Amino acid sequence: NLRCSLTGDGMERRIYLSDYTWTEDDYIPGQIKFIMSAPEKMGKASVRFYLNDGYTAPEEVEEEAVDTKSELYCTMIERSLMNLGNTYRIRKAIEKARAGKEVTLAYIGGSITQGAGATPINTECYAYKSYQLFKSRFAMRDNVKFVKAGVGGTPSELGMLRFDRDVLRDGEKPDIVVVEFAVNDDCYESLVRKILKLDWNPAVVLLFSVFANDWNLQDRLSPVGRLYDLPMVSIKDTVVEQFTKKPNEGRVLTKNQFFYDMFHPS
């Protein structure tokens, strides 16, 4: 790893790659990461690459803004539905919301559910935005509640403990629970069963995110969803195909537009 300190005074700091000893694994520069002096601090940085004399680079292709109203975008989103499953419990929750009864949407998972990569983290994360969409479509009054229990780096083993503490706190009885964990462990199915067996019969939706290397755990974890006939959503199936397309091939978004870093969407 190449490390250096930055002053944050707006002055350019140049790092000459030729000054460092490279190994065979270092022939392609990888992730660029900025670590702030204190948690929650933010800053703005511009990264430029300069070529030595005699070297050239391909012309940069400008990325077009993502058109979320386009037919291509809608087609891309349709691919996210990995399994429709038994929607009875979801439909019951929608009926409650439309009748003006109190409905609670809960989200439990890791850093993506927490909102890593979203700015601001509490209102631009997928959990809050999907809750807002549900509320706008089905709520009669202010009768839809939101519970977010996302903690970065936690497996479903801890999720078993956190579900009671963070989701069922204050007597909450969620009607729909979205489960998102990027870590495979033996407690994943146990967590799903724990939620399904609650007295008030909440719906469970499984969400599979994807990393920048186009990998996720849906092949290992989706059998749990199929066993219990649960709705499953795959971000991998939605966006990975886009990353190899050119603008004239129906590309909707680029990998650079989708990812905030190696693990989290923007």
Predicted regions and their residues:
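N-terminal secretory targeting modules
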Residues: 1-108, 113-121, 132, 136-143, ...
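Alpha-helical cap/lid subdomain in secreted, periplasmic
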Residues: 7, 98-101, 125-145, 152-154, ...
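Short hydrophobic segments within beta-strands
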Residues: 106-109, 149, 207
